[in-house]
A protein has these predicted regions:
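Canonical P-loop GTPase G-domain recognition
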Residues: 82-85, 91-141
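Residue-level signature of catalytic and energy-coupling elements of molecular machines
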Residues: 24, 42, 79, 89, ...
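Conserved nucleotide-binding/hydrolysis micro-motifs of P-loop NTPases
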Residues: 13-16, 45-48, 66-70, 91-94, ...
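Short, conserved loop/helix-junction motifs that constitute active-site signature segments
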Residues: 55, 79-82
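Nucleotide-state-sensitive switch-loop elements of NTP-binding domains
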Residues: 1-49, 53-56, 62
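Hydrophobic/aromatic beta-strand patches that form the interior of the parallel beta-sheet core
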Residues: 7-9, 59-61, 84-87, 118
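Conserved ATPase-coupling elements of RecA-like P-loop NTPase cores
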Residues: 20, 47-53, 71-74, 95-99
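Long, well-ordered amphipathic alpha-helical subdomains in the mid-to-C-terminal portions
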Residues: 119, 130-191
Length: 191
């Protein structure tokens, strides 16, 4: 197995509606077949589109900064529901500890397990090794299994539609009104 090497590859999102390109699932499968033990997927930012990473990830780690506004928290709500761990980076800045406490409180109000919430400062190299140790031993929390399968189902369906050889023809038919959206889905979905 490959344990200590690092392979980095940037991928354009292309036709994907989420932050994770459709081809990434195939790349992960290939890397696992090539004996890579761990594959880390970095997404492009925050927001609801980030939940699509659940379609291909075994574990989800959300990295936050301190003093994030309520609007950003609302954007990340879906992603935080899927989180197996949360890291509040930049713990050297004001508000980091308070933000970590608020995250823990919000998790404790929910159902299921509370993921670990860790403080780190990459700048000052504080908490980074400890967080890495926790992440390496992170077991599947089970708190988001249904949500992950939902995202996998949606991503698979999206990929099936986008890769259909009939897509352009169906889009043309929709544009002129000769078929309904339900008919288009039936054709593209192979029903």
């Amino acid at each position: 197995t490959i344990k200590n090497d690092i392979y980095i590859r940037s991928i354009a999102t292309r036709k994907s509606s989420g932050s994770v390109p459709l081809i990434v699932a195939d790349m992960i499968d290939f890397l696992h077949m090539a004996k890579w033990d761990r594959v880390i997927i970095e997404t492009v930012g925050s927001g609801q589109s980030e939940v699509r990473c659940a379609a291909i990830a075994d574990r989800i780690v959300v990295v936050e900064g301190p003093a994030r506004g309520d609007g950003v928290q609302a954007e990340k709500a879906g992603l935080l529901e899927l989180a197996d761990a949360v890291i509040v980076n930049k713990s050297d800045l004001p508000g980091a500890s308070k933000h970590a406490e608020e995250l823990l409180e919000s998790f404790e109000l929910g159902l299921g397990d509370t993921p670990p919430v860790m403080l780190t400062s990459a700048l000052n190299e504080l908490g980074v090794e400890e967080a890495a140790g926790v992440l390496l031993e992170l077991a599947d929390s089970g708190r988001s299994v249904r949500a992950r399968w939902r995202e996998r189902l949606l991503a698979y369906n999206e990929r099936k539609i986008l890769e259909s050889p009939k897509l352009e023809e169906i889009l043309g038919s929709l544009a002129v009104g000769s078929i309904s959206i339900d008919e288009a889905i039936n054709v593209l979905g192979g029903e």
